[in-house]
Every structure is written in structure tokens, then in C-alpha cells.
Amino acid sequence: MKKKKEYRIAVLPGDGIGPEVMQEAYKILNVINKKFDFNIYTNEYDIGGIAIDKYGAPLPKKTLNGCIESHAILFGSIGGKEWTHLPADEQPERGGLLPLRKFFNLFVNLRPIKLHFSLKKLSPLKKEIIQDGFDILCVRELIGGIYFGLPKGKNTFDKKNISAFDTEIYSTKEIEKIADIAFQLSLKRKKKVFSIDKANVLESSMLWREVVIQVSKRYPNVELIHLYIDNAAMQLIKNPNQFDVILCSNLFGDILSDECAALTGSLGMLPSASLNESFFGLFEPAGGSAPDLKGKNIANPIAQILSLALLFKYSLQLEKISHLIELSVLKTLEKGYRTLDISNGKKYITTDQMGNYIAKTLSELIN
């Protein structure tokens, strides 16, 4: 008898609403395990604030080792006011998530941002701007740039005039790697790459533009458009439908991907993937830990479920299953089911009810 293929997923629910929305992702995994001829094994590990409380560190060795032994990481959310008193490097994000990204060399962050037809009323943009919807993929460099550049610190010699500094630094190879990913992904889309920089002012952006132009020559069928960061922020508001793949440095990508997300009306709908060159990845909702929603059974689990869909697509290379999960979400929304954040003041369902409906729809689609 042929042995079933096995996949191992490290599950890191984290803090805030993370554990609640993760329960809904488990429902999807249960359906998939029953319906397909392979086995998905999950192991849960602590990270962030809960790990600080249990082990005194935001990224325990047990958690890191569990991730190393897995094919992918399904991540919830971390952080909360309980841990803001700690030194910056010991807080949940800087001490937990950032080192995890660095350890696995997760240099590319993908954030697909779509405006669902059934949710157009939630967008803050005028209906004439979003009448055609939009489908944007933000490709952000994740482990370089100003967040990691050295030196950084404070000058405290003059107590009356303290200064602080950070360093924005990128190498040719770093830019080439992320640009190559953006162009490859554009080939399966509308074949447009919008490269974002500030090349009229910043040396790092000047190099960014030079390298991206060189990479673009390997993709003659892809149109390359350069935009300054300030103009890009404006164009996203005026005409989001013009965009396809947006290629950004770490800082600019952090800003623009959140702006794109806001245009949909709810962060609770948006997944993200952080990948390395072998497509091992960490998959997480784009929103935060939302501690004010914790334990109320009202958080939107769709971003967590769609993050699982991205995990199947990129790390497990099972695009059919990824598509089925996305289709299950879409069909559930088309039936009119809404959590509080996307209810627009009308009747809404709970976190676990939304998970149940999506899992039921997935099961029906597979049958």
C-alpha cells in the first residue's frame, strides 16, 4: 500500500485574537485532511507575549526548533499593551516575529489585496473609483532596509537635545532577489510591475531604481513603471485599478501595503505570505492582534483562513487546494454572511460561525 504524503505545519497562534481565528483555520485543515489523499500534521508552539509569560522570551528555542522541522509556519498575531514596558528587543514583535523572519531568510512579503464585489460598499473610496474593483499584489522586501540597517541608535551626550538615527541600506543582490520575484509573479497576472522609490532624493533609492531596470531587461514582456513613494500613495487613492504588482523596499512596502489594505474596508480580510528562496514561508493575517476583540467571538477569521490558502499555494505547492479555499470564502460572502467588521451596521455572525460556513462550503465544493 502506497504511503500517504505527509506535510507538517508549525502553528503559532500567538496573542490577542490569534488563538480564536486560528481555530477556524483548523476547521479548514480538518476538511482537507478528510477529503484528500495526504496527511497534514500540525504542532502548536508559543510565540510573542504568551511565550514571554511562559518562558521569559518571545521566541523560545522549542518554537524555533518546531518551525525548523516543519514545511511551513501558520502564524496568528502577536503583541499587546501588557508587554510594551519591556525593552524594545524583548517585546513580542521585535523579539519574536522579526528574528523568525531573519532566521529563515524570509526576504519577500506578499500581500494580495482584492476588493470583493460583494464588499464594495465597505471601501472608503467613491464608487466611481472602485466600480471596476482592484486586484493588487504588494511585493515587499522584508529583511533589509532601514529596519535592519546598521548603525542605529541614540546620541544622548546632550540631554537637552537627544538625537536618534537609523540606516537605510540595500545591496545590489538584495534588490535583484526581490525584483526577480516581482517580475516572475507579474507574468501570471497583468504583466505590470510598479517599482516604488524616492530616487530623486535617496541614494538607496537611486541604486534600487538602477538594479530594477537591469532586472527588467530579463522580462521583456513585463511593463515596468517607476513611481516615487509620495506619488504612489496618491495614485492608490485616485485610481487603484491601474496597479498590478507593486515592488517596494521594506519601509515603503510597510506603508503602502497597509494603505492598500485600508482601501478594501477591513484588515480582517487580508492574508500575507513571507517567503525565502525555497518558498518555505510564514503565513499570517495582515491585521494585528486586536486585543480589544479578544474573547468576544466577533473577530473576522477570513484573513487567517486565506493565509492558510497562501500556505498551500506557495510552501506546499498545492494550488488546487489554495483555489478551493479562496473560492469557499468568496461563495460564503456571496451568500451574505458577514462578521462585525464587514457587516456595515447590519446583521452579523460570530467568528466560529463564519469558520463553520466556510468549512461547510469547502466540503461541498470538494464533493
Curated annotation (Swiss-Prot):
The reaction(s) this protein catalyses: (2R,3S)-3-isopropylmalate + NAD(+) = 4-methyl-2-oxopentanoate + CO2 + NADH
SMART domains registered for this protein in UniProt: Iso_dh
Site (Important for catalysis): residue numbering on this chain: Y147, K198
GO molecular function terms attached to this record: 3-isopropylmalate dehydrogenase activity; magnesium ion binding; NAD binding
Organism domain of life: Bacteria
Name of this protein: 3-isopropylmalate dehydrogenase
Described function: Catalyzes the oxidation of 3-carboxy-2-hydroxy-4-methylpentanoate (3-isopropylmalate) to 3-carboxy-4-methyl-2-oxopentanoate. The product decarboxylates to 4-methyl-2 oxopentanoate.
Keyword flag Oxidoreductase: yes
Binding, substrate: R101, R111, R140, D230
Localisation: Cytoplasm
